[in-house]
Amino acid sequence: IFAAILSWTVGGFVTGAIGTENTLLSAVPSRDMGGFMLNLILGTVCVSLSLPLGIALALGRQSDMPIIKWICVVFIEFVRGVPLITLLFVANVVLAYFLPPGTTFDLILRVIIMITMFSSAYIAEVIRGALAALPRGQYEAADSLGLDYPQAMRLIILPQALKISIPGIVNVAVGLFKDTTLVSVISMFDLVGMIRGPILASTEWNGVYWELFGAAAILFFVVCYGISQYSQWLERELATDHR
């Protein structure tokens, strides 16, 4: 997955720097991107971006500054109360009305922003629950060592909270990866969109229905099961409290 993302990113920089002639990778418009690779790109990028944003929102919600706390609470509660499909329609249609005339904002970038916002709100609540589960003595230990707030969070609190929240974060990541199939409703042909659209519309695939969706289900199961197994391995590696 990471190799594919790296190839896609580096290929864009290379083609933009030296042109499209005699290059192995050429720039692809977002409307032309599709298939299972689109699901992998959206899932990997959005989970990677939503984790630090979710940590910031969780800390902001517990902040003593009223403005920061209010902004984080409103953002989390609003995003959690809106279906993801609504945010995707906003990314596809509504955002264009707020951009200056003649401005082109790539569709896949708009979708990444909306999905990241959606998943970060859920990750923030998972991390907030982990922070609340920590004993009060951990905070007092940080104070007794003379650590300020950033040092206490970076060295003592967040490492323990993130270890506790691994199952919840993985649950959000798996759900987010499966929700990337919703981009088909805004005319982005991911794996499911390709099956429901051009593949089933082709006469060459007449009578073939369950096999296509069965293959798609197997692909998604392999990725989600791999994520689950990795999280269990990570939990065992980080279970230092019983050693």
PLM region descriptions:
Residues I1-R243:
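Transmembrane alpha-helices and adjacent helix-loop boundaries
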